[in-house]
A protein has these predicted regions:
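Short glycine-rich, Thr/Ser-proximal phosphate-binding strand/loop in the N-terminal lobe
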Residues: 97-116
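Nucleotide/phosphate-binding catalytic cleft detector across ATP-hydrolyzing
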Residues: 1-85, 90, 102
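Extended, hydrophobic alpha-helical segments in both membrane/secreted and soluble proteins
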Residues: 91-95
Length: 116
């Protein structure tokens, strides 16, 4: 199961003839016209895309109601995708920072559940 993935995009720059917004450029480049974008990702677009010379990486998260764009970063960051795994047990809490591309656990921490 894929929880999220990244795609690097070289977006076309705006011109007098092509005045689409950055969101529309991203959706067109992904060929995902119905994808939604989180408010945080949407707010990050300006001036990020122009400063990155329209070369950006988007993080996508597939769900029951389609694909969400949850983050936009300048440049190509497809080599780095981290996730957090949580295990909330009846007696202990465990967390692991995971490299989602390799499955390698980078860090882990645990503690006794204080509600016990």
């Amino acid at each position: 199961m894929t929880f999220s993935y990244k795609r690097f995009l070289n977006l076309p720059k705006p011109t007098k003839e092509d005045f689409r917004g950055d969101r529309e450029r991203i959706l067109d480049a992904l060929n995902m016209p119905d994808a939604s974008m989180t408010l945080e990702a949407l707010r990050s677009l300006y001036p990020l895309t122009a400063r990155a010379d329209y070369a950006v990486t988007v993080t996508l998260c597939p769900g029951d109601r389609g694909t969400d764009i949850i983050r936009v970063e300048p440049g190509d960051t497809t080599h780095r995708l981290l996730g957090l795994a949580l295990d909330i047990g009846s007696t202990t809490l465990e967390m692991e920072l995971v490299d989602m591309l390799t499955g390698q656990v980078l860090q882990n921490v645990g503690c006794v559940n204080s509600q016990v």
